[in-house]
Amino acid sequence: MNIYSNYYQFKHIASSDLEVPKRLLSIIKFLRKNYKNFTEIQEYKDVNYFLRFLHENDRKEINNLLYTLSNSQYDHCRKCYWYLGELPPKKDTKYKNAKTFDITSKQKNNKIICEMCEESMTDINLRCTFHKDNTDTSYNWNTHLVLQNMICTIYTSLVENIKDNQLVNDFMLLTRPPGHHSSTDIISGFCYMNWVYLMSQFLINTLNYKVCIIDLDLHHGNGTEIMVKDKENLLFLDLHYFARNFYPGTGNEKKFVADNVINVNMRKNSKDKDYLKTVQSKFETIGDFNPDVFIISMGCDIIINDPFDIMKCSTSLYKQVFDLLKKTFNKKIILALEGGYEADNVHNTVKSFL
């Protein structure tokens, strides 16, 4: 199993205490030392090598997003998210004690001090901002560079495993930030670009492949659903927890989305056997679709002891799903990390493939 990681992921600082660099630190250190088929991609400039293989609309959306991120004003305190200037119109608990604040009135010795928590905001590294009215996914001065590094990582992982117009190896992307909550006009849930969708489009456009995306993250892949619905050569199967007021609030299995979208709501405390049985129950539909490749959105937040504490799966589940798909369909499989906020769970899930 070839494993790839975006070298600059540890430069990415999110607004959450969950989506943090340390969740991947132990497994990255282990792979660097012990696994010869592990590659960290440092390139971040030549994103157009990848974008040229995408549809024109996808290229425009990505370039527009990168431009927006690289030209943003960073006006929130990274520690408490106090806003410098006029408050955002959206009501949010982060701003419940806030009041309009003139940035020039809170300067001490030429330093900008956060009025709420008294932290320095002079250094741009200590500031962030949010996309439109979204307050769960922040970005700062280098977010666009981290995303460019991720795009280059995807491109490299694909081309290194393609030979004679065929995908010849399985591989894994051990990367952050995740992607399955993002779509063309949505930055949400720690996600900025939808990596599994972009990979599917590369494979469809270059190899004329049919792609089956299977999302097993705890949360519904709402961004992926938006991107793939009614698209030719794509089938999307999403197993996730669904409950009132549980993020992102989409993915009700009782609601029809599109012929190529299958949502399955998993019960709380579901275990390996429940996921395997559910995936297997969709094999007839998958067989009728006859994919050339599987892409698995690998969310380790369904594993026992994750901070969400909803599902009770083991760290071997994804390897079991991998083996089941291999045995049944004998197709190449790409795994892409999504959520999962207990470092040991991510570490041991990856090690199960080595």
What are these regions (language model features)?
Residues 1-354:
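HDAC/HDAC-like amidohydrolase catalytic core signature
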